[in-house]
Regions:
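Extracellular, repeat-based ectodomains that mediate carbohydrate processing or recognition
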Residues: 1-396
């Protein structure tokens, strides 16, 4: 899942700036002409942050440890103009994850609210306009995701989309028009019988490419789906393994859609064309971080990715993906030989459950037999004891 404390911004000049929150300090690292990243501390006492670009400005929104909510803007990533949207003393913003969508005359804010009494989480919307906040609007109940509790993307000047977990095993999308505020219907995208441990979504022209990781009883799966219009295509299982999978990522490279993930810390990929034709699994041979993370990627006018992989050991520098790959020598041991339908996946799960149930039944039968033997032995000893005990004579 996305790490909410690291984000990547593609600048108009074409380089990538890295924003990170470390020990309540908000840092920006921008690449210099010699390829190094120069750190610059933007603010201290920060508990969380959000990042976006609008027109010629970059915006940072961050709650502080004393309860303030600050909106800061910059045109060069060096000189920042902080502006308080909420003054000190309100604890609601501490550690609150937000998604923002600024406009010329309004500021739109989406955030999660926890209700300690009930344990519920609510996705809310608030509008800041003409110097004051409008009453918040409750969008939906949701279950926070690991890392970033929910994800938000801007699809246009007046159009955003939210991704969040609407049920225990369902990741859904909801499109929203900002002005006038119009809430779209909920659209389930990912539904798994196991646990969805990570997902990545790329909106590309009229298609939505969905890649996710599913963990079941004894294996991990990498699954791809394509949404075109309102129809979500069938799931394709790209990879199955008993080892751990993480950091799935969808990105566009020229006219190809790349489906990327790590299996047992090894980078893998498939090439997808038109959302239907999927090539073989290949192992990536380019240098890849030993300790990696995934962060939000923002700012490309022609978005080729919505996330990026960074290096924990090298100040979160973005990993550079190249075309260096090699086919797996024995793909049948790891990857699915062909895209399998979700029915096959369910049948495998049922077979595993039947096997597990049979094993447990045998264990229970063995325990029952052991206890029955012990009970029979005790009953025999009790009967023998009663026979050997003399009967008292009540006659005077």
């Amino acid at each position: 899942m996305q790490n909410p404390n690291v984000k990547y911004l593609k600048t108009p000049q074409g380089d990538i700036a890295v924003f990170s929150l470390e020990h309540n300090r908000l840092w920006c690292r921008r690449q210099t002409s010699d390829g190094r990243y120069t750190p610059f501390c933007i603010a201290e006492g920060v508990s969380a942050f959000s990042l976006c670009q609008y027109e010629s400005y970059t915006y940072l929104l961050y709650p502080t440890t004393d309860g303030r909510l600050i909106l800061s803007a910059s045109s060069d990533l060096m000189q920042w103009e902080p502006r308080p949207l909420w003054h000190a003393g309100d604890k609601r913003w501490q550690n609150t994850y937000c998604f923002m969508a600024p406009q010329k005359d309004a500021f739109h804010l989406f955030y999660g609210v926890s209700q300690p009494q009930s344990g519920n989480h609510i996705l809310e919307y608030a509008l800041f306009q003409k110097g004051q906040w409008q009453p918040p609007y409750q969008i939906d109940h949701f279950l926070p995701l690991p890392g970033a509790p929910f994800l938000g993307r801007r699809l246009g000047e007046n159009h955003v989309i939210l991704y969040y977990r609407s049920h225990r095993s369902t990741i859904s999308a909801r499109e929203i028009l900002l002005s006038p505020f119009t809430l779209g219907s909920l659209s389930p995208l990912i539904q798994t019988g196991g646990t969805c441990t990570d997902f990545s979504i790329l909106e590309d022209n009229q298609q939505m490419h969905i890649l996710y990781l599913s963990r079941n009883l004894f294996r991990n799966q990498v699954v791809y789906r394509c949404k075109q219009g309102s129809a979500v295509g069938r799931p394709f299982v790209l990879w199955e393994s008993g080892s751990a999978c993480d950091h799935c990522l969808v990105y566009r490279q020229q006219d190809k859609i790349i489906l990327f993930w790590c299996a047992n810390s090894l980078p893998m990929r498939c090439i997808c064309e038109n959302g239907t034709s999927i090539g073989p699994v290949e192992r990536c041979t380019f240098p890849f971080p030993l300790q990696s993370l995934k962060g939000e990627f923002i700012g490309a006018s022609d978005p080729f990715a919505s996330e990026a992989i960074g290096d924990r050991q090298n100040n979160f520098h973005p990993a550079i993906f190249s075309e260096n790959t090699q086919p797996l020598s024995q793909p049948q041991l790891y990857a699915a030989s062909a895209p399998s339908q979700v029915r096959e996946e369910k049948n495998d799960e049922l077979e595993e459950l039947r096997t597990l149930l049979s094993q447990r039944s045998e264990e229970i039968s063995a325990v029952n037999a052991k206890w029955k033997a012990q009970v029979d032995a005790l009953q025999e000893r009790l009967a023998a004891y009663e026979k050997s005990e003399p009967i008292e004579n009540d006659t005077p």
